[in-house]
Regions:
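N-terminal entry/capping and adjacent linker segments that precede and initiate structured domains
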Residues: 1-389
């Protein structure tokens, strides 16, 4: 291999799954440096998005390890750990972040996760779950005279043209809500900067409990709003740092019980009519209401259970569409047979959070300047060891 031109080596490696690529780092310094090569990182990410087999699902669950003390567990499944057809097995990601046993995933972008501290109510880390690398985010804006926020929503996005990543937080304060203003304050962090920027009030409030952006499409993050008279999809253009409105589909039932997702790079919406059916829509031309197209409809009577809230997770192998059903199960729709079925996952917890993820070599450390804290956790048979940078 070392006799091949570097360009050919990079081309070969760019087509490999993320797990064997990360293992290469343990071989020698040459392979460690090669997996940090910017050309390989870019080519591998490009190949991963082209290949549907590169899709994985990251699961987060909380395990009771002591009285009143929970620890967060990260696991994943992909096309390579199917036991037989629809039977999958959780693979644990044996990583530990410093001083942070309990966290939530509030964004996945280009192989990186944005991790949120639910106790402090702040975004805490940018983390690559397959390489173990992380970077600590600077503390967000919190007025010293104000009590802690009531709620915080997060978005994590990327500018392709400039290779810039941004985190946005929408912060709700009880005092403002009490005074009749339910709109959150918007703060933006460009990764590489040492401080957040206050860009003013968002024009809409979001659905209560909607912490994470549900879709990153066309350079914009998307949430749902339930302000009186404004049942709409709220967008945030990551480049322009401007809020906007995207029209939702004209659902067959007229009821708005929907969740957003991304299917083949397009905004999608899954809606359900209580106890009767669920329908999936895709926006073929971004921002154009008439381009919403219904992909399929599934009746509860045909599948034998009440479907309820579902959220599109993405296309799996053979064009199947995976859906999150509530917070405890996965469904798969097969467009060839027009059938919906449940997915069995060995070792799955009773409840979990799940995000669609494409494994990458993108390093959180490369996105930050000097003066911030970096780390790398390397798992092995003897446990987990931290390397500081």
């Amino acid at each position: 291999m070392d006799k091949l031109p570097r360009e050919i080596i990079i081309n070969i490696l760019s087509r490999l799954p993320i797990k064997p690529l990360v293992r290469c780092r343990c071989l020698c310094k040459f392979w460690l440096n090669l997996t940090h090569d910017s050309q390989l990182i870019t080519m591998h990410l490009h190949q991963s998005f082209k290949n549907e087999d590169s899709l994985s699902l990251i699961f987060l669950s909380n395990i009771l390890v002591a009285p009143n003390h929970f620890q967060t567990r990260l696991s994943f499944i992909d096309n390579n750990n199917s036991n037989n057809g629809d039977h999958y097995t959780f693979v644990d990601l044996n990583v530990t972040l410093p001083h942070f046993d309990n966290f939530e995933i509030l964004g996945s972008c280009n192989g990186l996760l944005c991790l949120f501290d639910p106790l402090a109510k702040i975004p805490r880390y940018i983390f690559n779950p397959f390489s173990g690398e992380y970077a600590t985010l600077p503390n967000p804006i919190r007025p010293s005279s104000s009590p802690p926020p009531r709620d915080v929503a997060i978005g994590f996005g990327y500018l392709l043209e400039s290779n810039v990543y941004k985190v946005i937080e929408l912060v709700y304060y009880s005092s403002a809500i009490f005074n009749g203003d339910s709109r959150p304050e918007a703060h933006v962090l460009t990764l590489g900067d040492c401080s957040w920027r206050n860009i003013g009030k968002a024009p809409f409030s979001l659905i209560r409990g909607s912490k994470a952006s549900q879709a990153f499409v066309n350079g914009a993050l998307h949430w749902l709003s339930d302000m009186p008279g404004f049942d709409c999809i709220v967008s945030f253009d990551v480049g322009e740092e401007q809020f906007g409105v995207v029209p939702h589909p004209e659902f067959e039932s007229g009821q708005l019980n929907y969740r957003l997702g991304v299917l083949r790079g397009r905004l999608s919406a899954a809606n359900y009519n209580y106890g009767e059916y669920a329908e999936m829509w895709v926006m073929n031309e971004y921002g154009v209401k008439s381009s919403w197209t219904k992909c399929f409809k599934v009746n509860c009577s045909e599948v034998g259970f009440n479907i309820g809230y579902v959220r599109p997770l993405g296309r799996w192998r053979s064009g199947e569409v995976w859906l999150l059903h509530g917070s405890s199960s996965l469904l798969c729709y097969d467009p060839r047979t027009k059938s919906l079925r449940k997915i069995s996952i060995a070792g799955s917890p009773h409840a979990f959070q799940v995000v669609t993820h494409v494994g990458s070599l993108v390093s959180p450390q490369s996105l930050f300047g000097e003066g911030l804290h970096f780390g790398l956790f390397v798992g092995g048979d003897e446990g987990v060891h931290q390397l500081e940078f």
